[in-house]
């Protein structure tokens, strides 16, 4: 009887330990039945980063929703919790809302994505004959160059192809700061930007435009980067420098989804890898989810430490 009681007691103790362990694991996941809402921004690189993060969060046991959001408007959603996280925030282009909600501690910056970036003004390389002196920005001010870039829409100014208006851009401000005779004309979308670059390359049509890397188009088109004019003020509104890219979450994220929070803090994106996936989606027409799943299947050595670390 004593032995039986001892075994029974041990069994109860083991059951309690297992229950406590299971409860601890559930607590680490937090509100796993409530979806984590990831911001889906306008550019393909962000789609890639976001879907890799999302599929890995699902491996951790979370439900994930992808919510379309504008680059500036997303910060209102992150501040009020209607968006949970955004994993590819280019800090040189965050607008006026971001610093306010960050200072108010409505959002939290959880670190670098480690994405090696480029941003600035590009041109097809044949433009160096149209505007002698490129890549020096002063070459753009020469009358012959301005005339070559002028269109009926912008004459007598040259046309500068800018980001879509809802992305936000500093190009118009920098042009004005330096009294450059150009009118910034917003593009309709990322696809329209790339299409115009490719058309200019094919037809040798003069073009100067705002662009960024990593991007698959940079691997397929011969472009130069303008050596930028001086900054009137050392701020994001008046300067273009290779930007840092951070990950941002709603301020309540860590308390609500602890393991997801740990995972996103360690999540990284390699620019070369991202560019390969963008090429597959944008040029080869492959499905985004399928491309991301294939990458995850082939790169367990990359992401497994992030997931294992989040499990604790």
Pin down the residues of each PLM region.
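Pocket-flanking alpha-helical
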Residues: 50, 69-105, 196, 216-221
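A conserved helix-loop-strand patch within extracytoplasmic ligand-binding domains
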Residues: 106-160
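Ligand-binding pocket segment of bilobal, Venus flytrap-like solute-binding proteins
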Residues: 83-88, 159-232
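Short, well-ordered beta-strand elements
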Residues: 30-45, 62-67, 157-160, 264
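Immediate post-signal peptide segment of exported/extracytoplasmic ligand-binding proteins
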Residues: 23-37, 57-58, 149-157, 302-312
């Amino acid at each position: 009887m004593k032995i039986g009681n001892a075994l029974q007691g041990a069994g109860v103790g083991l059951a309690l330990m297992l229950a406590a362990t299971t409860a601890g694991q559930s607590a680490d996941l937090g509100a796993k039945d409530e979806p984590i809402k990831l911001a889906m921004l306008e550019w393909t690189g962000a789609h890639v980063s976001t879907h890799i993060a999302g599929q890995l969060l699902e491996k951790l046991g979370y439900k994930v929703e992808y919510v379309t959001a504008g680059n500036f408007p997303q910060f209102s959603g992150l501040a009020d919790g209607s968006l949970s996280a955004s994993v590819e925030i280019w800090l040189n282009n965050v607008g006026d809302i971001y610093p306010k909600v960050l200072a108010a501690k409505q959002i939290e910056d959880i670190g670098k994505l480690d994405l090696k970036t480029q941003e600035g003004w590009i041109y097809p390389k044949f433009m160096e004959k149209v505007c002698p002196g490129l890549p020096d920005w002063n070459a753009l001010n020469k009358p012959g160059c301005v005339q070559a870039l002028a269109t009926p829409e912008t004459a007598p100014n040259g046309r500068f192809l800018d980001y879509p208006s809802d992305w936000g851009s500093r190009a118009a401000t920098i042009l004005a700061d330096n009294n450059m005779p150009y009118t910034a004309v917003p593009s309709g979308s990322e696809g329209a930007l790339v299409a115009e670059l490719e058309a200019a390359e094919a037809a040798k049509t003069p073009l100067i435009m705002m662009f960024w890397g990593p991007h698959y188009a940079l691997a397929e088109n011969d472009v130069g980067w303008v050596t930028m004019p001086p900054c009137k003020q050392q701020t994001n509104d008046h300067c273009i420098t290779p930007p840092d890219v951070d990950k941002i979450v709603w301020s309540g994220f860590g308390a609500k989804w602890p393991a997801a929070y740990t995972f996103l803090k360690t999540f990284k994106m390699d620019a070369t890898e991202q560019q390969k996936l963008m090429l597959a989606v944008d040029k080869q027409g492959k499905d985004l989810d399928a491309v991301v799943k294939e990458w995850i299947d082939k790169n367990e050595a990359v992401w497994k430490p992030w997931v294992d670390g989040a499990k604790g």
